[in-house]
Amino acid sequence: RNGQSHRDGADVSFQDIRRLFGFQSITVGRWVTAAEQQIAANLFFDALYDLIDILQINERVVSLNGSLSLAFGTGGQKHANAHYHSAKRQLALAKNAGGGALAHEWFHAFDHYISQRFLSAPKPLLFASQAWLDDAELVEHPLNLRLADCFQLMFLDADGSAPNDYVLR
């Protein structure tokens, strides 16, 4: 992370993060030292405020209205430094997760969260982007139409008739 500090040099705790952003829970692995926990809490705090600045949202939106949990240094997956666990609605980062991992996983969480408002027949573990790719029926709403336009720009070629090179990889 190369951005400005949002803490003015002060240390924050994971409890501070939970309270301020409204996360449902925060779990820290038992093998995480106190020093690692402090460094991580400060980095999480700054990364979450970077996301707030970029998206022009407030603290409560970052936790998707209190529906998200965080895990650090626990419950990892082989070959993954970070992942979003949809059944738990949990952002999980390993101790060695790199810069940008939190934002990347947050967008998976948002994709999952928004599906309940995006789709006419939502399912608990369905993601909006996949449902859109599968031509699922959408709830008619101006924001949903804008999101569908974004998906078209991200996933289809210039004329909108086929998957783009990124999707095909």
Task: Walk through the language-model features, giving the residues of each.
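Zn2+-dependent metallopeptidase catalytic core
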Residues: A34-S63
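Active-site-flanking segments in enzyme catalytic domains
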Residues: R1-E36, E59-R169
